[in-house]
């Protein structure tokens, strides 16, 4: 019934496309007039559009003409005229939606249309992609079109200076990776002046490979972190003990990816820990004093039993490097959190890096939701359309191809074992190779790609391997995968963003020529030779059937399978795709084994035989849908929790910006002084209480600790004195202390000093707050056992922690302001600035990367704004000797190593 209605009325997507074609007719009607313009007149259209916008026109008012201008500029610069379907893709992007366009349909060129149009508003446009290679390539190639029309183009890649980044972000259109954008946002919110920031306010972003960024990478946060206590020795000891455990000592659930000790396992671990003198004899793993060890044991168990080398990570240059499960690429600089990375380093016997404490973090989900207008493009988005709508409020429009797809997607073949599957794959590759048909073999991990490579080596079939170990050659290898007799093994979707052209990519082959060693004539001859060779090979490859894509197993996500299929059949080229499966494959074994095994037993599968059955295909699709649904729920749940932190982060970042912008910090100082003075006085002199109930001694101590005030005992001895009068005197005395500092150091110097103290204190308490939230998140799921909703509990406690953080901020800020002094012998007035470059230069960022310790970075202000009681470098403190600790902040972890805050440990009686 539903299918009949679809045939009559069409799908919602069909109706959207039909409406868009009427818009395209309007753009096409402008083309003859635009073509008659000279180059200079075409460039002046940009100036004309900007004037219209300033006079009240909207982007939609000029959209059709702007698109026609870009199309003509592209034709003149590159000889490439946007197809009608590319104009549709551009309109979809301009209207803040996601466009699904097949591989080879020219998404890079499509982005020029909305990028140019939206850049006319002079608020900046970000074109986002997944790696530095694509950023450099696309900004250089498409930049010629923008430059022709008088717009500037910037390019952001790793390793650039702040000055270079600022210039790039101030361009009309900026190409950047998602990682660099996210880290620049976090870094900007750790800067000490607006002039030092590199980003402009958020405006419009176009995300290439949008599914990879907004879905595949949504669970991993961007993190700027700093080192905490060194526990590398303990990770090493626990790792040795975990290696001695038996299979019966733990239970693992591959579906949920969890692992837990059994009762016998706990006893075994306790025995091993006792023998190693890590815990006392006869004490238990879950005894209070040993609870911290549970974390180390659990992470070591996960490292040894849930994470595999060359599948989840690899070891390169003595470092454990994470492999992206969706792309097969190495995730440079990223580290697993919560000690898992250290456990993997212990497992692989490489140097164990310190654990990190989060200083700033954000997920891509929340970063990209900062843009008032967001759009994206990819070859595969329809399967994830509900999630993109639900989380990002982005609709997906599938744009028809310019040429009809002639690729044939063949039925899956299912075998009883991996060996039988590999034999069948080998047979097909041999057949294709003998006929000259290029083959792309897609695998789900480095381990699998190397297994296939070994099979081909044994059978003397030449081939290229593309996986995380050969990331540098990625674009070139994948671009030449369509050559005659080429056999390429690729991990998942490595090489996305680079087209596979039948016969080879002549441009990339030309780039390999050593031009310096050739004369101009010889170079031209070589170029013509390459072009002729690739053209001839293209004819041979088409005759052989085009690119044959072989999938070695189904991925957890149907979208990834579709991406692999989409490698073949670009722009109407011929091609074939086929998946080979076995009962040993992870997806089959974990999610669909019982059902499918029953079918195979019924059908009587014999060794070496393949089977095709609709029920098996349906079971596989259901298994994939089940996993997709599970992963979606994880991402959705992550967002619910992250939204709590995101709301708090927005408040802190907005406050931080206001502090930096403020011309006078005295108002905040004055109001906070008044608030704390009232609070302290009422604590020790409660309103309406009797004089004998007043705690004058501790009031004096607290006022001196907070405001550096010595309380006049004669004042308190007056019979008629009230708490209001004492409060008033405290406020006046504190104000006079501040005014005397202004006279001694100058108002400007004091203003900058107070502002700096406020910013550094805010950064410190925010860092501690993030640490507290991390701990809260780790254990909050256990509240479900008490019939409580973990999310509601997290929201409630996170709010309480946030209030506590704000109170700490006020106390620490006031204490520092009233106690510090400036050594004018070592500082000039012009040295008091908030730029603090040394601090910024010591920042490092990662997806859990070792970073910096803020108070070790050093700056003019840090060395010369000395508190009355100096602070000792934490590394120089002896845990057993409190006299070596110097001044310890009440909210710092106690130097004794107890894990408690100082005010609840050795500072309890201060």
From Swiss-Prot:
Keyword Protein transport included in the entry's annotation: yes
Protein name: Protein translocase subunit SecA
A GO cellular component entry from the record: cell envelope Sec protein transport complex
GO biological process: intracellular protein transmembrane transport; protein import; protein targeting; protein transport by the Sec complex
Annotated catalysed reactions: ATP + H2O + cellular proteinSide 1 = ADP + phosphate + cellular proteinSide 2
Signal peptide residue numbers: none
Cofactor note: May bind 1 zinc ion per subunit.
Family: Belongs to the SecA family.
Organism encoding this protein: Rickettsia bellii (strain RML369-C)
Any one Pfam family match given in the protein's UniProt record, by short name: SecA_SW
NCBIfam families named among the record's database cross-references: PRK12904.1, secA
């Amino acid at each position: 019934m539903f299918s009949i209605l679809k045939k009559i009325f069409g799908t919602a997507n069909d109706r959207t496309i039909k409406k868009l074609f009427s818009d395209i007719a309007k753009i096409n009607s402008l083309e003859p007039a635009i073509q008659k313009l000279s180059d200079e007149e075409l460039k002046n259209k940009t100036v004309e559009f900007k004037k219209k916008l300033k006079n009240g026109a909207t982007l939609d008012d000029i959209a059709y003409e702007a698109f026609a201008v870009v199309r003509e500029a592209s034709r003149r610069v590159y000889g490439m005229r946007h197809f009608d379907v590319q104009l549709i893709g551009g309109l979809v992007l301009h209207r803040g939606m996601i466009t699904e366009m097949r591989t080879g349909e020219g998404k890079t060129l499509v982005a020029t249309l909305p990028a140019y149009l939206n850049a006319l508003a002079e608020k900046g446009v970000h074109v986002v992609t997944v790696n530095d290679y694509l950023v450099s390539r696309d900004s250089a190639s498409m930049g010629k079109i923008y430059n022709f029309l008088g717009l500037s183009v910037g390019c952001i890649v790793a390793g650039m200076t702040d000055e270079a980044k600022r210039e790039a972000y101030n361009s009309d259109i900026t190409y950047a990776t998602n990682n660099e954008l996210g880290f620049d946002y976090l870094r900007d919110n750790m800067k000490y002046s607006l002039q030092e920031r590199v980003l402009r306010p958020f405006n419009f972003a176009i995300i290439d490979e949008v599914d990879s960024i907004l879905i595949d990478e949504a669970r991993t946060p961007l993190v700027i972190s700093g080192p905490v206590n060194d526990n590398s020795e303990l990770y090493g000891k626990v790792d040795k003990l975990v290696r001695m455990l038996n299979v019966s000592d733990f239970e693992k659930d591959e579906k949920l990816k969890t692992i837990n000790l059994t009762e016998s396992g706990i006893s075994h671990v306790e025995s091993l820990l006792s023998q190693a003198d890590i815990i006392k004899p006869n004490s238990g793993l879950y005894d209070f004093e040993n609870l911290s060890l549970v974390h180390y044991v659990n992470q070591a168990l996960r490292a040894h039993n849930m994470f595999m080398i060359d599948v989840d990570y690899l070891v390169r240059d003595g470092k454990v490097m994470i492999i992206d499960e969706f792309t097969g690429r190495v995730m440079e600089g990223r580290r697993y959190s919560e000690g898992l990375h250290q456990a993997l380093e212990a497992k692989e016997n490489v140097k164990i890096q310190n654990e990190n404490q989060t200083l700033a973090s954000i997920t891509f989900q929340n970063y990209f939701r900062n843009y008032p207008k967001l759009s994206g493009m990819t070859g595969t988005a329809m399967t994830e359309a509900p999630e993109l709508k639900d989380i990002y409020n982005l609709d997906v429009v599938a744009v028809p191809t310019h040429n009809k797809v002639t690729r044939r997607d063949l039925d899956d073949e299912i075998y009883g074992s991996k060996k039988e599957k590999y034999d069948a794959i080998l047979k097909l590759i041999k057949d294709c190779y003998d006929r000259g048909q290029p083959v792309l073999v897609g695998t789900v991990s480095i381990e699998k790609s190397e297994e296939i490579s070994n099979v081909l080596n044994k059978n003397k079939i030449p081939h290229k391997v593309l996986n995380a170990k050969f990331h540098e050659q990625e674009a070139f290898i994948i671009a030449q995968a369509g050559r005659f007799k080429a056999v390429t093994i690729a991990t998942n979707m490595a090489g996305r963003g680079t087209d596979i052209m039948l016969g080879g990519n002549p441009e990339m082959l030309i780039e390999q020529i050593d031009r310096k060693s050739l004369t101009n004539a010889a170079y031209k001859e070589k170029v013509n030779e390459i072009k002729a060779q690739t053209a001839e090979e293209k004819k041979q490859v088409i005759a052989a059937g085009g690119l044959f894509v072989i999938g070695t197993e189904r991925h957890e996500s149907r979208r990834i399978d579709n991406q692999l299929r989409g490698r073949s059949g670009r722009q109407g080229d011929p091609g074939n795709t086929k998946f080979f499966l076995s009962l040993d494959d992870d997806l089959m074994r974990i999610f669909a084994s019982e059902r499918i095994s029953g079918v195979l037993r019924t059908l009587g599968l014999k060794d070496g035989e393949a089977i095709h059955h609709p029920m098996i295909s349906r079971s596989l699709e259901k298994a994939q849908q089940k996993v997709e649904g599970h992963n979606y729920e994880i991402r959705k749940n992550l967002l619910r929790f992250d939204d709590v932190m995101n709301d708090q982060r927005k408040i802190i970042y907005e406050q931080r910006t206001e502090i930096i912008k403020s011309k006078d910090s005295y108002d905040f100082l004055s109001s906070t002084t008044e608030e704390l003075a009232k609070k302290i006085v009422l604590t020790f002199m409660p309103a309406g209480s009797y004089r004998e109930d007043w705690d004058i001694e501790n009031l004096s101590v607290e006022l001196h600790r907070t405001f550096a005030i010595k309380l006049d005992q004669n004042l308190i001895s007056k019979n008629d004195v009230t708490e209001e009068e004492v409060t008033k005197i405290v406020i006046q005395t504190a104000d006079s202390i501040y005014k005397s500092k202004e006279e001694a150091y100058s108002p400007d110097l004091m203003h900058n000093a107070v502002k700096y103290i406020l910013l550094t204190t805010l950064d410190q308490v925010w860092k501690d707050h993030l640490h507290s939230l991390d701990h809260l998140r780790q254990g909050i799921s256990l509240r479900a056992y008490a019939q409580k909703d973990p999310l509601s509990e997290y929201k409630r406690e996170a709010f309480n922690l946030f209030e506590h953080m704000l109170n700490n901020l006020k106390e620490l800020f006031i204490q520092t302001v009233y106690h510090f002094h400036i050594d004018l012998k070592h500082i000039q007035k012009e040295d008091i600035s908030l730029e603090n470059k040394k601090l910024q230069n010591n920042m490092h960022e990662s997806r859990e990367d070792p970073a910096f310790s803020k108070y070790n970075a050093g700056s003019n202000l840090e060395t010369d704004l000395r508190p009355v009681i100096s602070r000792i470098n934490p590394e120089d403190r002896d845990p057993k000797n409190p006299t070596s600790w110097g001044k310890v902040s009440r909210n710092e972890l106690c130097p004794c190593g107890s894990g408690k805050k100082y005010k609840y440990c050795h500072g309890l009686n201060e």
